[in-house]
Amino acid sequence: RYEDYAHLIEHYRGGYGQFSNVCMINEANYVPAANEKYTYIELGNIGSYGNITDCTVAYGKDLPSRARRVVHTNNVILSSVGGSLQSCALISSEYDNAICSTGFFVVRSNAINSETLLTLFKSEVMQNLLKQSCSGTILTAINHTELQKIVVPKIRKEVQDKIAENIQKSIVLRNKSKSLLENAKVQVENVIQTGGV
């Protein structure tokens, strides 16, 4: 139950705060210029590890009407849709100034580093708090007001630093494995094209 998960956080020895006091949400609407090209991130582009797996590059006139939020490096985007709350990602420098769907909350914090924020959003405790704050009948979602009420643990700085270090290491390794996979694919294609010679 919501009370049980909230109780866990409220008894965390490092303390806690309401989301509204710990995090900031960028809700500013940005209207893309019709003839400018943009990088657009939507729900389907979010990987299971809190990474962005793909994006759409398109002119403003070709983007959907929900493409209205600008994101910056180290923002964390969190899906507001009930069935996809686990879809959250850390914005890397590669996606600085990209646009994301209004189906995401764009979050940052001065008290919690981005990697820890991402880890919190993906944790079982926070996922359950988010789920239980959703409303709606056909398509449930969490709204801004309910999100602001959720309690967030204040993680100690040394723990945050360790989390950040581990997340950054995993990003480097993931990028390296992606590069190795691409190289392997090229080698296989070359072998096929040359008839195995």
Positions of predicted regions on the chain:
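Short, surface-exposed loop/turn microsegments at beta-strand edges and helix-strand junctions
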Residues: 32-38, 56, 69-71, 90-102
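A structural connector/turn signal
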Residues: 65-66, 94, 137
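Non-catalytic DNA-recognition/assembly elements of restriction-modification systems
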Residues: 1-32, 156-197
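A short glycine-rich beta-alpha junction/loop motif
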Residues: 84, 98-105, 135-161
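Sequence-specific dsDNA recognition surfaces
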Residues: 20-29, 44-73
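A short beta-sheet element
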Residues: 77-121
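Hydrophobic alpha-helix feature that most strongly marks membrane-spanning transmembrane helices
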Residues: 27, 82, 86, 122-125, ...
